[in-house]
């Protein structure tokens, strides 16, 4: 198994009132279940759901806090970085292999001009060229 989340399932866990109150102050009420559903899709190591979410807003509203919570939940199964870098840097795509979630908490709209690689990753349509440096390949062999 390549994906192992750093959390323990607790069926008797209390209602996450602090988290829900935070979301209530950040999102419209009808958007909260959408975010929760999206996070649930991200827990599944498949891209059949073809999921990508953009949360737009002004600075200092708490969007980055969602990323911090997701980082704690997903651990090493999440990559934070630049969506634009996926299109610009041919080696950045290789870093997304076996990653459940990629978060760009400060995305520039210019990053969405070249969406062919992002679309290929989200939809799993077409071939994605993953390039590794020789050093990375050595680490993979020795690990």
List the predicted regions and their residue ranges.
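Conserved nucleotide-sensing/catalytic segment adjacent to the nucleotide-binding pocket
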Residues: 94-131
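Conserved small/polar residues in nucleotide/adenosyl-binding loops
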Residues: 132-133, 137
């Amino acid at each position: 198994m390549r994906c192992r989340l750093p959390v323990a399932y607790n069926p008797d866990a209390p209602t996450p009132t602090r988290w829900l109150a935070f979301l209530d102050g950040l999102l419209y009420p009808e958007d909260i279940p959408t975010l929760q559903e999206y996070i649930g899709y991200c827990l599944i190591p498949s891209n059949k759901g073809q999921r990508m979410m953009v949360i737009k807003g002004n600075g200092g509203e708490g969007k980055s806090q969602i990323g911090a919570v997701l980082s704690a939940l997903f651990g090493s199964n999440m990559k934070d970085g630049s969506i634009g870098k996926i299109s610009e840097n041919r080696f950045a795509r290789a870093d997304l292999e076996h990653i459940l979630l990629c978060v760009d908490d400060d995305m520039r709209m210019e990053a969405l001009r070249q969406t062919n690689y992002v679309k290929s990753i989200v939809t799993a349509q077409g071939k994605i060229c993953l390039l590794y440096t020789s050093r990375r390949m050595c680490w993979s062999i020795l690990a």
